[in-house]
């Protein structure tokens, strides 16, 4: 069977003329256990004596000689072919381990890419998350095995990168469609998946640069685009520079293709490369293709670079060229959409940017525009930076909110509202009265465009702390009940954190803390998450640190400076002779003053609550972060750390908890 496979392999690759000759008069055979040899008949042996030949025999002999020359040349070809074929490693054999792994990889890639784009009859994406993420993980595991054995070609490696890139987009889409942002202070699936994809892409890029695996131009483009979407701009450039300066010409070729260079052009400009140098690179890369039309991806990169360099006329000229059939044939709609969005968010000429924005709203373009919220946010920021005209900002925000409609996901609306509300409070930071009136008008207007939701109020509650007004914070807190919006744990954290911007008694902070803990227990948390501890920290330690930086007085209370030896000496009467007659009254006044200080000492409150509730930490490592870690990062907390072990916190209230576990 093995010999038959070898023969079939050679027959499919050697010239037909030689195969035919080897079958006929010469009766030749291939020997695969040594160099290819040719067995001749005795009549063909030049050492054998031959009788005298007639003229016809001479002609026949001449033809045979010519045939022998052809055969000899073909024999040499087969020998060369033999040297380049590893007959002991036929990967296409069904019995080969590599064959089964390659098939498994192909199945995973096909299954993953299909799951990421499957749609229902109504056009909506089908939720096949578990199948998709399983395919991503399995593909990466098989990739590692094939890299070790050297059985992975550039096509399959590129498809693995493509799947990783698609996974980033799927992860991002799932995040923006969530009703609330994930708790990044505790563990979340999307956070873990982002880290996993990032590390996987780094592993693949390392394999490419180390010549362990090769990729096509498409794989290189997906790789760099992935790092760029992860906001790892410096790493994106470093990978590209290392690739184009590689000694491996195949790597250089892959990373110099137009659609790859288009990814890095804007980054090169942002990192100091001159516009003229980028134009030269653009022209060089544009010529590096045999396609009849240019690369839309390269042009998109050049347009973004032109906009960043304020070369708006050049950008418009390229866009017009992209839209014409003469210049680029039928351009991919995705690239046209990306170019349109680039003009909205990245063009510093506000007239041009707003023109593209209005065209996107009107939906009368020959290509479909999915108005990305990131582009709208960039436009709003550019308007504010250049004009400081808040009315223009309101106009764009209002139009975008109406465009997205009432059913848009909280992720998209929250992203837009966060940018808008930040600019709002920046505009009214010193004019609280006018700002409060305008804020009420905006809340009413938003309720008419899209019903008031929890994320919208959360954003306002977070940003309004710049006014440092307790009445405003309490008024916004009441709005949740006014609009019949249930408070999630995120809201309780924001409320507690807001206490760090105003002056309130410690009892108020304790009350907000207990409410937060009760909510955490209610939703099934089994330990106090990092985000909960962070809210307490900001309400207490961060507040005190800011007061200290701003010149406020700060000193430890009596309980903070407790000295057992000194207390024992006082109790024994050792210092009675040194007391003045009126010392009793003064001592009482001193104690009252210290008691008031203790009631308002937020750092003391922080460590008391930490010690009382620390048993509900996730693990000792978390407890160390919220005790010694805080003292390490906050100067005002350092004197308190040594007092934690001696604190009596038995009187601090802990509500009944059903789900919390004693972990520490």
From Swiss-Prot:
Primary site of residence: mitochondrion
UniProt-annotated location(s): Mitochondrion inner membrane
Boundaries of the annotated transit peptide in chain numbering: 1-32
GO BP term, pick one: sporulation resulting in formation of a cellular spore
Annotated membrane topology: Peripheral membrane protein
GO cellular component, one term: mitochondrial inner membrane
Keywords: Membrane, Mitochondrion, Mitochondrion inner membrane, Phosphoprotein, Sporulation, Transit peptide
Region (Disordered): 38-68
Record carries keyword Mitochondrion: yes
Mod. after translation: Phosphorylated. Phosphorylation promotes binding to RNA.
Subunit relationships: Monomer.
Function: Binds the 3'-UTR of mitochondrial mRNAs. Involved in the processing or stability of mitochondrial mRNAs.
Family to which the UniProt record says this protein belongs: Belongs to the RMD9 family.
Protein name: RNA-binding protein RMD9, mitochondrial
Organism lineage: Eukaryota, Fungi, Dikarya, Ascomycota, Saccharomycotina
Gene: RMD9
């Amino acid at each position: 069977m093995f010999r038959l496979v070898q023969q079939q392999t050679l027959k499919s690759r050697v010239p037909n003329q030689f195969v035919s000759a080897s079958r006929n008069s010469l009766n030749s055979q291939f020997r695969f256990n040594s160099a290819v040899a040719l067995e001749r008949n005795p009549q063909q042996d030049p050492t054998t004596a031959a009788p005298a030949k007639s003229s016809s025999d001479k002609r026949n002999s001449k033809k045979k000689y010519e045939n022998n020359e052809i055969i000899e040349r073909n024999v040499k070809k087969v020998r060369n072919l033999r040297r380049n074929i590893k007959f002991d490693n036929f990967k296409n054999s069904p019995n080969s381990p590599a064959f089964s792994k390659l098939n498994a990889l192909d199945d995973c890639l096909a299954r993953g890419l299909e799951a990421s784009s499957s749609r229902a009859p109504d056009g909506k994406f089908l939720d096949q998350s578990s199948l998709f993420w399983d395919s991503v993980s399995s593909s990466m595991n098989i990739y590692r095995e094939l890299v070790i054995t050297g059985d992975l070609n550039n096509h399959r490696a590129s498809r693995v990168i493509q799947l990783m890139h698609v996974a980033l987009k799927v992860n991002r889409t799932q995040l923006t469609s969530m009703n609330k942002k994930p708790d990044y202070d505790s563990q979340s699936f999307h956070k873990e998946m982002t880290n996993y994809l990032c590390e996987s892409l780094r592993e693949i890029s390392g394999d490419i640069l180390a010549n362990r695996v090769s990729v096509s131009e498409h794989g290189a483009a997906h790789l760099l685009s992935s790092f760029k979407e992860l906001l790892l701009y410096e790493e994106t450039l470093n990978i590209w520079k290392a690739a184009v300066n590689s000694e491996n010409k195949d790597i250089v070729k892959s990373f110099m293709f137009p659609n790859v260079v288009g990814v890095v052009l804007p980054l090169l400009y942002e990192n100091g490369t001159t516009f003229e140098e980028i134009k030269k690179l653009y022209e060089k890369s544009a010529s590096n293709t045999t396609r009849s039309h240019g690369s839309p991806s390269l042009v998109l990169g050049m347009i973004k670079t032109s906009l960043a360099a304020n070369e708006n006329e050049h950008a418009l000229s390229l866009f017009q060229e992209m839209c014409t059939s003469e210049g680029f044939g039928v351009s991919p709609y995705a690239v046209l959409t990306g170019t349109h969005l680039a003009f909205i968010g990245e063009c510093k000429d506000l007239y041009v940017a707003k023109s593209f924005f209005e065209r996107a709203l009107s939906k009368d373009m020959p290509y479909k525009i999915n108005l990305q919220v990131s582009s709208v946010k960039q436009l709003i920021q550019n308007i504010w930076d250049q004009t400081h005209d808040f009315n223009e900002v309101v106009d764009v925000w209002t139009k975008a909110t109406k465009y997205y409609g009432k059913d848009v996901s909280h992720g998209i609306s929250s992203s837009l509202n966060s940018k808008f509300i930040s600019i709002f409070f920046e505009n009214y930071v010193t004019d609280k009265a006018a700002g409060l009136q305008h804020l009420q008008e905006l809340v009413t207007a938003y309720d008419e465009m899209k019903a008031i939701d929890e994320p919208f109020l959360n954003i306002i509650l977070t940003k309004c702390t710049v006014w440092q007004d307790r009445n405003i914070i309490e008024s916004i807190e009441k709005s949740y009940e006014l609009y019949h919006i249930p408070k999630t744990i995120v809201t309780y954290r924001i409320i507690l954190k807001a206490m760090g911007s105003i002056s309130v008694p410690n009892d108020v902070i304790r009350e907000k803390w207990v409410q937060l803990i009760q909510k955490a227990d209610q939703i099934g948390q089994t330990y106090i998450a990092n985000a909960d501890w962070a809210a307490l920290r900001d309400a207490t330690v961060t507040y005190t640190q800011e007061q200290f930086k701003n010149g406020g007085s700060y000193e430890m209370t009596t309980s903070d400076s407790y000295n057992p030896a000194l207390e024992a000496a006082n109790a024994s009467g050792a210092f009675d002779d040194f007391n003045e007659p009126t010392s009793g009254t003064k001592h009482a006044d001193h104690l009252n003053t210290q008691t008031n200080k203790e009631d308002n000492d937020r750092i003391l409150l922080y460590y008391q609550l930490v010690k009382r509730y620390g048993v509900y930490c996730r693990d000792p490592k978390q407890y160390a972060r919220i005790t010694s870690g805080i003292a390490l990062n906050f100067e005002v907390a350092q004197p308190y750390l040594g007092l934690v072990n001696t604190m009596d916190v038995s009187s601090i209230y802990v509500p009944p908890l059903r789900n919390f576990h004693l972990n520490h």
